Amino acid sequence: MISGGGPGAMEATHVGAWMAGRSDEETSDALTMLQEAPSFKDKLWLETAFQVMKKYPNPTYISLGIPTWLYGHEPATPFATHIAKYFDNSIREDSILTIAKGGIIYAPGSAGTMQEIFQEAVQNHYLSFGYASPMIFMGKDYWTEEMPVYRLMEHLVAKGKYKNLLMSITDSTEDIVETILEFRSKKTE
């Protein structure tokens, strides 16, 4: 698992990797503990994370967080087992997209997320790595109304400006998992 290595949705990637292989009850307990200080702006955010890590020591699963020095206000997630910091955000984004060959899940975000979307679209269009990987947009209202990038991408595909885009949009985590597993099974056929 790889992410931008920061808080929020990026951190969720690493919490998932940290808890992989554990029971649903243990994962639920860890998430309940983390709800005590859900934002990095909360005074006990880091302490709460360390409590979860102590209660549920990391097994052999690894994850890579790649934060950037550019966003000094966002701390790196403590759940990433490996950290690689970049000075240049565009190189950082390209590195993440190059490594993440199994698909990208786009949670509501800001400028960096927008950059990732269009960089991934170009990589998929040109089949830079020999195939296109799924672009999964999490949050229908956000990606079609508040930040209508999904509609723009659909329009560009319809006009022939982009090819090879495997896009989906959903509010369901189950749909996200199904999309990734389906892609993975087709890739190994």
Where do the protein language model's features map onto the residues?
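C-terminal functional extensions of proteins
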Residues: 96-98, 131-189
